[in-house]
Structure formats: C-alpha cells, structure tokens
C-alpha cells in the first residue's frame, strides 16, 4: 500500500511526521511512504533514523498552506504546496491514501476539489471515531459542513453505517440523531425533517434522537449531526476528557493518603488515559471522497501519526472506499426507481 503524507502539516512538522512515518515503516512491512515537502529538509529529518530507504519516496514541494489562509484560495493558488501535492498523488492513483495534520479547512477542501467526491455523494463528511464507556462511537459530521440539509444527514448516516460494518465489524450498527431531546418532535427544522427521513430508511438501524449527555456512553455507534453541532460536541468531549484526567492527577497529589493509593490505582488510571488519548486513534476519515483521506490532529506527535497511517492501512484492507461507493450507488439507484 502506498501512503501519501503531507510532510509539512501540523504543529510539530516535519520532525513528528517523519518519526511517525519511520515507526509505521517498521511496524507495517507492506506500506510505502510518499512524503511531500522541501526535499532537503525532509531528507535531513529522515537521516536521524534507520529506515528502509526503498520504501520512502520524496516529493519536493516548496510551499506550505498555513492554518490562517483561506482554504479554497490556498488550495487553488498553492499548487506547489505539500498538501496539494500529497492530494494529487491520490488523484493520479499513485497512492491509495493521504494523511495530513495541517489546516483542516484546506485538507477537506482539497480532498473535495482534487480527489473528488464518490458519485452520488452530496457532501463528504468528517467522521472521527471516539472512545465511549461501552465502546467506540462515530460523530458524523464533525465540522466539514456547518450548514446541512436533511438529505445530507441521511447520507452521513449511511456512510457511518458502512464504516462500522466494514471497519469495526459491527453487523447492525445503531444510528442516532444528536438532538436536544429524545422525543421525535424535539429540535429545529433540520433535525425534525431528518428524523422523519431516517425513520423511513428500512436499511438503517435508526434508534431515534440521542441527547448530548448520552453521546459518550458508546451505546450508539453512529451519531449523526450537522458539522456545527458535531464539531462543538467533538471539542467539548476532548476538553472534558482532558479536564477529568487533569483533575484526577491533581487529586492524587493533594494528600499523603491519596499518594499511597497510587500504586493500586495506577494500572486502571493508565488504561483510562490510553482510552481517552486521541493519539491512539490517529485521525478522522473524510468519508464520501474517492480516496482514503485521513485528517490527523494538528498537534499530532509521532505516535499519533503512526496510528493515522495504521488507520489508513486498515481502511484499505477493508476496501472502505469500494464499499461506500457500492452503497451510495445502490441507494441512488433505489431512489431513482421510487421517483
């Protein structure tokens, strides 16, 4: 498998990106890395490590897209940027996947404009998988589409369902609509209309509305919402997780008795920290485009980047894009028959 990597994306590029690539090359013997960025700079960063030189291809790119640039304008103008060149590798079928920890807006825009949408997809969606009390869950959309239509959300539900079936091996994923109440009549015009459409979808296991306080249980596999709500829920969840871990750490240090209990609690606390750590999950797939596109966290370190590559590899092994294309095409055909 060939993976295109934006070598200049993220807060700790290129060092963390390069180290993550080296770790991935060591762990996964069936991958090749095509890394984009200033070639001399990238080669210097790689020179600090031992790695299989036969499996790394350097693609020289002189420009970098920063987070404060207008996404669409930057993607269109900076054709020699590390991000655009990485995306073009997937567009031109030189790579099966692309990963970037750079500007989210530019990445999502570039995926749509350069890689292109799967035929029949109205809007691609950002779909991070998060740790829950009873298992992982997906938030879709988590920020790609701030303004959405009911038909978009129904398609998000279908894409999320396909993901859980093919990647997570869940036979009948539960799909819920994020709302301010469980009752069908609750919410705004968007959620009310979406609820009716999802209820009519016989091939989606729609369990109804899900209140925000129930999001983190993991009892519902796919949580559907527009990008504004999804991004808010995602950032709130990350913030609460960080706060809880910080509070536990402070309480442990607060008294002598608490410190005495640390050796007994340490394994459980370490396991909790691992479950809540975004680095373990790598990145969020951008579902609905023709290639495997993974958005890594902007502050990703080497471990997070290695896990983003692991994710992309798993998506490829499970033919996620092929299965999404098949389902969306089938759904579009069924809709045409019913017109």
UniProtKB/Swiss-Prot annotation:
Catalytic reaction(s) noted: a fatty acyl-[ACP] + phosphate = an acyl phosphate + holo-[ACP]
Alphabetical keyword list: Cytoplasm, Lipid biosynthesis, Lipid metabolism, Phospholipid biosynthesis, Phospholipid metabolism, Transferase
One GO term (biological process): fatty acid biosynthetic process
Main EC class the enzyme belongs to: transferase
GO MF: phosphate:acyl-[acyl carrier protein] acyltransferase activity
Pfam assignment, any one: FA_synthesis
Assigned EC number: 2.3.1.274
Record-given protein name: Phosphate acyltransferase
UniProt source species: Clostridium perfringens (strain ATCC 13124 / DSM 756 / JCM 1290 / NCIMB 6125 / NCTC 8237 / Type A)
């Amino acid at each position: 498998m060939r993976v295109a990597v934006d070598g200049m994306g993220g807060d700790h590029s290129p060092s963390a990106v390069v180290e993550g690539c080296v770790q991935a090359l060591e762990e996964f013997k069936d991958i090749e890395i095509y890394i984009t960025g200033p070639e001399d700079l990238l080669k210097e960063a790689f020179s600090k490590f031992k790695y299989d030189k036969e499996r790394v291809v350097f693609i020289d790119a002189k420009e970098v897209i920063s987070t404060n640039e207008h996404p669409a304008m930057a993607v269109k103008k900076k054709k020699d940027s590390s991000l655009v060149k990485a995306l073009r590798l997937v567009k031109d079928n030189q790579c099966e996947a692309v990963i970037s920890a750079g500007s989210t807006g530019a990445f999502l825009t570039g995926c749509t404009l350069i890689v292109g949408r799967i035929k029949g997809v109205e809007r691609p969606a950002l779909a991070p998988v998060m740790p829950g009390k009873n298992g992982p869950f997906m938030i879709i959309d988590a920020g790609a589409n701030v303004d959405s239509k009911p038909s978009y959300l129904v398609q998000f539900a279908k894409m999320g369902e396909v993901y859980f079936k093919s990647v997570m091996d869940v036979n009948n994923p539960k799909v819920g609509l994020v709302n301010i109440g469980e009752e069908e009549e609750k919410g705004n015009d968007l959620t009310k209309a979406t609820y009716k459409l999802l209820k009519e979808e016989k091939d989606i296991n729609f369990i109804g509305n899900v209140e925000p306080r129930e999001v983190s249980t993991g009892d519902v596999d796919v949580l559907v919402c527009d990008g504004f709500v999804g991004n808010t829920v995602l950032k709130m969840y990350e913030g609460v997780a960080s706060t809880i871990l910080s509070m536990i750490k402070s309480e442990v240090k607060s008294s002598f008795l608490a410190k005495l209990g640390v050796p007994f609690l340490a394994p459980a606390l370490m396991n909790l920290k691992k479950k809540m750590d975004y680095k373990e999950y790598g990145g969020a797939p951008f579902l609905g485009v023709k290639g495997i596109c993974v958005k890594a966290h902007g502050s990703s370190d080497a471990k997070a980047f290695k896990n983003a590559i692991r994710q992309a590899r798993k998506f490829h092994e499970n033919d996620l894009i092929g299965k999404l294309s098949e389902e969306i095409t089938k759904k579009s055909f069924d809709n045409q028959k019913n017109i």
